[in-house]
Amino acid sequence: MTTEVGSASEVKKGSDQAGADASKEKAKEVENEQTPVSEPEEEKGSQPGPPVERQSTPRLRKRGKDPSENRGISRFIPPWLKKQRSYNLVVAKDGGDKKEPTQADVEDQILGKEESLPEEESRAKGDAEEMAQRKHLEVQVEVREAKPALKSSVETQPAEEVRKDKEETIQDTQEEKLEGGAAKRETKEVQTSELKAEVASQKATKKTKTVLAKVTLLDGTEYSCDLEKRAKGQVLFDRVCEHLNLLEKDYFGLLFQDHPEQKNWLDPAKEIKRQLKNLPWLFTFNVKFYPPDPSQLTEDITRYFLCLQLRQDIASGRLPCSFVTHALLGSYTLQAEHGDYDPEEYDSIDLGDFQFAPAHTKELEEKVSELHKTHRGLSPAQADSQFLENAKRLSMYGVDLHHAKDSEGVDIKLGVCANGLLIYKDRLRINRFAWPKILKISYKRSNFYIKVRPAELEQFESTIGFKLPNHRAAKRLWKVCVEHHTFYRLVSPEQPPKTKFLTLGSKFRYSGRTQAQTREASTLIDRPAPQFERASSKRVSRSLDGAPIGVVDQSPPGEGSVPGPGVISYTTIQDGRRDSKSPTKATPLPAEGKKNTLRVDGDNIYVRHSNLMLEDLDKAQEAILKHQASISELKRNFMASTPEPRPSEWEKRRVTPLPFQPQASSHETLNVVEEKKRAEVGKDESVITEEMNGKEMSPGHGPGETRKVEPVAHKDSTSLSSESSSSSSESEEDVGEYQPHHRVTEGTIREEQEECDEELEEEPGQGAKVVEREAAVPDAVPDRQAGASVLPVETEAQEHVVAQKLPGEKGAHGGTAEQDPREEAEEDPHRVNGEVPHLDLDGLPEIICCSEPPVVKTEMVTISDASQRTEISTKEVPIVQTETKTITYESPQIDGGAGGDSGVLLTAQTITSESASTTTTTHITKTVKGGISETRIEKRIVITGDAALDHDQALAQAIREAREQHPDMSVTRVVVHKETELAEEGEE
């Protein structure tokens, strides 16, 4: 490369130097050609100074070339500009040999300074500094060459002028390029910032992109609003509640349908677009959690929306009820929407606009109109309260049904409610799992599993599985169970499990407020009662349409009411601490001799069914009701009906809340006086609405279902125990599990007590060492059965008959009859706390259950007719003359511990069976004394009749029957007790 540059310089100077310089240039060419070869020798010191200068020159070029060529604008400089460096070096060589070392030193110093600069600083300075340094170097070399080389400078002056002009031109060009490059950089930076701003604004517009959401409200109107596409469900729900002026909003939710025939609840914690894939966004506003006691709601507007939801449930068939119930609820609907009955305006009301029942008939409209006349004076809020008080006692109130199949492929329905999980088959409730009884809920693919707590005598937990249509249905059911358990049972929501690495299964947990938190927040509501228009009638909710003298004051719910002229009267049924009012004119019951039962094959049990669920199938009963043309006829049939069994006092005490206790006295006083007056007329006063039989406890129970018989659970557990609920290898979409933490609230203790009652119904083991048996012997007891295997049958049988007891007998409800003290002392040590009021579970008459304060002193009224005898027992026993006779038999083999130390109580069970003239109560206790298990059976038989009995014969028959029924046990004690009052005799 050096040779080419040197020869090119000589060609340019050929016109000025002709002869003498030619030989010198040739010698220089030879030396330049030999320079690469002589470089190793120069390093060893064999060459003089000038070759060292030539050696440093290529290194300088190499050092100067590499950085400049690798960065900046130097890559775009044409080659003829880069050759100027070699041209200057050639001129320096011609100037003289003495200055060459100095030139090399200067170049090395300048290059050393350049290389010592930081790389970042040299890059920032760019190519402009590099060109300035080169120019400075060339100027210094030329100045130093001027004195010793005058001749050569004169000869080369034109060439230098040309070179200077070219260098200035090159410098100007480079400066212009550098300035242009800087301007371009600034322009690019500005453009980039503008583009970024535009992109950011575009992104902002994309983020604020709105989607139209439409919500169908409970009154049929539609609410629309624009939402951000990334908005969460809570935003939409809050807007809807704000539009409705609703504060108690935790009972409600939004439903959407993303798949045919399947609706899902909108999760407020997730984005809507992640839950609802399709546009437009369509939702329906519904009640999600049905309040077990609507009277505890604070605002009327909340009760109004609950009424609207229940009307939809009734019209769609989700909430089945009888013809009479349809008519009663429809009459309250008319009263709330249109006010008092007005014959002039009634013709203008189109009852076809109201869907009172799935099958809307003309006869139903007539019955609704007749009942509407009796509600004069009720405000809309009061009518809604009465509507809810009757609707909450329906067996399917608040039950969310899901289609499923059991292990044998039989179609069933799983119902989720406030108290637990219900199993329905052919519209019959065949099983119930309370929340305290469930340990874990899980799903895997399309299978749904519940792990049930083992019974007292069981060692292993049982898992019951159900097959759902698909995995979405299984996940939806699982979510509903998680939400219901958290809302009704927990004090505060459970936090989602912490996310771990590579964990499977759903992390879903209920994120809203629980019922306890909602009630606490409701007490803090401090605003005037909101006024709202009812959609169907445009009637203002808080207006009263006149209040005649006989107005029934029913608001707030729970306060007493005084029956006035033309106003429906109420009969109060004391429920421990709360009184339940039922209209006597409104809900007639058909006469029924016995409760219908369903026998389950393979198990010695009866499964009670809900009468309300089967009323639509009972055509004969419906036909009878349809022939009743007037209110008086309805009342007569209602009075003649057989009362249905009532829950035990223990069940009632567990259910009823405390705030209603102070109001019981006034209700009882008013209604007992009314009962006395009616009893004087001679009517059988056993008044109760159809919805009230056993439903005072809580929603989800069938009417009258105060005792739970659940051997079906053991059957399912056996058949499904091999199925696994493991979720270790499934994705989040197909697997989820939930283990309830039973942090109960104040109002949920009743399920725990129900579970204890269920466990006490376990069959006792046989082969005990000592048996003590108390029995009174009737002439014939057809429904007394032997052994523990028939205990569930005896349990069910007691619900079929109305108890007919003398006032003097000692009943399970704390009766006041005189009793042998020895017998009392013998029975009391074996009774579990809470079991005494549980003995005669449904045996008392339906009117007054009198074991709880306040005490109202009344006289006892006995009503007798030719076909039926029913006595009403009160707390005060009339003073009568009685004759008592007691015969006691004690075995000489009595065990010493039988009457003394009772040992450790394991289980206690009480079974009551009744027939027309006989009541049999069996009390079974299992204790452990000194490591020995002892089963003790005490049977008490009460016979009501006029015939005289031979006590000796009764005693012998009792001993004989006891030994025949239990040959492996010994009879230790038999007591025959006879009480004679006037002309009637009672034996115990």
From Swiss-Prot:
Region (C-terminal (CTD)): 838-988
Positions bearing Phosphothreonine: T745
Entry-linked PROSITE patterns: FERM_1, FERM_2, FERM_3
Residues modified to Phosphotyrosine: Y606
Post-translational modification N-acetylthreonine, affected residues: T2
An annotated GO BP: cortical actin cytoskeleton organization
Residue list for modification Phosphoserine: 7, 38, 86, 116, 201, 379, 395, 492, 543, 555, 561, 582, 610, 630, 698
Compositionally biased spans, kind Low complexity: 555-567, 718-729
Location of the region described as Hydrophilic in the Swiss-Prot/TrEMBL record: 495-651
Keyword Cell inner membrane listed: no
Location in the cell: Cytoplasm, Cytoskeleton; Cytoplasm, Cell cortex; Cell membrane
Tissue specificity of this protein: Widely expressed.
Record Pfam families: 4_1_CTD, FA, FERM_C, FERM_M, FERM_N, SAB
CDD domains: FERM_B-lobe, FERM_C_4_1_family
Keywords carried by this UniProt record: Acetylation, Actin-binding, Cell cycle, Cell division, Cell membrane, Cytoplasm, Cytoskeleton, Membrane, Mitosis, Phosphoprotein, Transport
Stated role: Required for dynein-dynactin complex and NUMA1 recruitment at the mitotic cell cortex during anaphase.
Official protein name in the record: Band 4.1-like protein 2
Name of the gene: Epb41l2
